[in-house]
Structure formats: C-alpha cells, structure tokens
Design a protein with these regions (language model features):
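Residues at secondary-structure transition points
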Residues: 1-8, 34, 57-58, 138, ...
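Glycine-rich phosphate/adenosyl-contacting loop at the front of the ribokinase-like
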Residues: 1-27, 34-45
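Short, conserved phosphate/pyrophosphate- and ester-handling motifs at nucleotide-, phospho-/glycolipid
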Residues: 17, 153, 217
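Hydrophobic residues at beta-strand termini and immediately following loops
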Residues: 27, 76, 202-203
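Short hydrophobic segments within beta-strands
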Residues: 27-29, 66
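Ribokinase/PfkB-type carbohydrate-kinase core domain
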Residues: 42-53, 66-149, 154-199, 262
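C-terminal catalytic lobe of FAD-dependent flavoproteins
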Residues: 63
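Conserved phosphate-binding/catalytic region of the ribokinase-like
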Residues: 167-265
Length: 265
C-alpha cells in the first residue's frame, strides 16, 4: 500500500508541538511548488508561523519502505533544497530568531548553517538538537559543550562519539562533554536519560500492535520538550515523551492528529 503525507523531522516536531498547544515558529526551506504551498498552509492552520527564504527548487521529499513489522526497511530522501540553504538566506530572519529563548535544530541542516547558528546564538539561547540519522549527527560534533538538550537513538549516539558503548556509557560521555540534558532511545530496550542529577533508565512497555514506526522518535522528542517547557523533571518528561511516541506508533500518519489526548491522562 502506498501512502503520501507530510513529514520530515523538523516539520513533525513542529506539528506535534503545535498540537500539544505551543506557539511555534518554523524556519525552513520550502519550495515554491504545490507541495510546498500545501505544507505551509497545513501548518499555518495549526497556528504555526512558517518562515522560509524564497527558493526555486522543489520541496524536500522522502520515500520510506516498511517491512511486515512496520519497521523501516529502506528510505530515499531528496533534500537538495535544505542542503543548498546558506547563511545569507537566514540573515533576514536574524532578529526573529534572536527573540526566542529556545532554538531546536535537526541535523538535516548543512554544516555551514549549523555552525553559524551556534556562533550567533549559543551564548544567550538554549539550543536543542534532534540527531536525525547516523550519517548526519556528526554535524554537531564541535558544539556539544553548548547543547542544552540532545536526543538520538543508540546507533546515532555511537556514530557521534565513535564508541561502541552502551546507552548509559554514551550518556556519561555526552554529559562530560558539556551537554546539559541528553536522551538516548534504544527501541523496546528502553530509554536512557541524564543530566546533572545522574543517569537513569526508563523501561518501555512494547505495544501489542504497531501501525507505523514513522515519526515515533520525533513524537518522543516533542513530548519530552513539551513536558520540560511545563517545568517537569527530566524523568517526568521522558515518561510523557514515551506516551507521545506510543501515539505515533499507533497512527498511520507521521504525526498522530489526536496526540493532544495524552494531555488528559
């Protein structure tokens, strides 16, 4: 069965946060094509402010093939428009970015843009990152000491740190390098999380049925961030993030449209 929907790590995070009641500004590269216009309109219908430089390229697209267990088997991504984003494209939005307390980055951004954001905003802003993939997480290598929050899966953390260690050991290394808070997910083996108060484990109870794994990691991050913004502890935030991830796993879409139901639990 072939299904088309909007996705992308950053976009998924934005939609999740908007559906959880947050006012979000999304600065990204969107093409001036029908897909880009529809994507922008859909987010704006959720009260998201969408800012984008003007591009003639096509909006990014992504094709994923899932196996019988609803796990991703292979994926192909066309992100040329993001890869071509330059620092000068962001300069018109410099003051808008400066007005926010927190900046969330996903590692789909190219190295030049990531380095500029840190050099420009690291002193007075909380910077939070989502690793995205093992081959892109190294883009954050030189900025770990300025990270307020880091989230990845186990494979991505191993690629970042060049260590075949356990999640707990990798968390310890991240904290030693100056990361303030970090979360490493390891599928049904659970979630490791840590901050200045130590490193802890969260047991994940597997769902009996998974509809799609697409977007589950993005929902986990969004749920954790929502709880932290509500001034919950990291332990409470991880538990809430797990609820958000389970919502995504139970949905055929990259973002569960009923994710706000977990606010009632």
């Amino acid at each position: 069965k072939i299904k088309t929907s909007f996705g992308g790590v950053g976009r998924n995070l934005v939609e999740n946060l908007a559906r959880l009641g947050h006012h979000v500004t999304f600065l990204t590269a969107i093409g001036n094509d029908p897909q880009g216009k529809q994507l922008k309109e859909e987010l704006e219908s959720l009260s998201v402010r969408v800012l984008t430089p003007s591009y003639l390229k096509n909006t990014s697209s992504y094709l994923a093939i899932y196996d019988e267990d609803s796990d991703m088997h292979v994926a192909v991504c066309d992100s040329e428009i993001l890869d071509s984003m330059k620092v000068e494209d962001l300069l018109p939005f410099e003051d808008i970015i400066d007005s926010f307390q927190s900046i969330i980055l996903d590692m789909n951004l190219n190295q030049e843009v990531i380095d500029w954001i840190f050099s420009r905003y690291q002193e007075h802003h909380s910077i939070l990152i989502e690793a995205v993939s093992a081959n892109k997480v190294s883009r954050i290598q030189n900025h770990l000491s300025h990270l307020s929050f880091y989230k990845s899966n186990l494979l991505e953390a191993r690629y970042l740190l060049h260590e075949e260690k356990s999640a707990a050991e990798l968390l310890s290394l991240l904290l030693e390098k100056g990361v303030k808070q970090a979360v490493i997910s390891d599928s049904c083996n659970g979630i490791e999380y840590g901050d200045e108060n130590g490193i802890h484990h969260f047991d994940v109870i597997p769902l009996k049925k998974i509809v799609s794994a697409n977007g589950a990691g993005d929902a986990l991050f969004a749920g954790i961030l929502h709880a932290l913004l509500e001034e919950k502890t990291l332990k409470e935030a991880v538990a809430f993030g797990d609820k958000a991830a389970k919502k995504a796993l139970s949905s055929p879409e990259a973002v569960a449209t009923d994710i706000a139901d977990i606010l009632k639990d």
